[in-house]
């Protein structure tokens, strides 16, 4: 698999997850009570799971900003790094996948298994797997380039 294909797949996952976070943010800001999207039964479970943070879970405002920052902004930064071919692009993609997986584990702890959480858990696993391939391909292409340049400069002498 070529680096270009892996980079494109990683961009897909980054855009998809960042867009999902933006939509989730919009839903929670549009109706902080959660009634419109039938999320209101989740608030008592949040307060029960995190009693020391119960003051934050009177509505979904804090959850909305947490979702946007933790999954939206981090993936947006990763997308930027991938587009710029930054040396940390593959690592940022791996970290985004790990952060999403941690987020999903917290959701499993609070609410148990739900279809959306399981789906995003699978998306996180795909993002992590692709980022691992991305890292490996970047490393092998960097090693290959270094070996060619070493061969070229030592052959001239």
What residue ranges belong to the model's regions?
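Topology signature of small-to-medium multi-pass alpha-helical membrane proteins
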Residues: 1-157
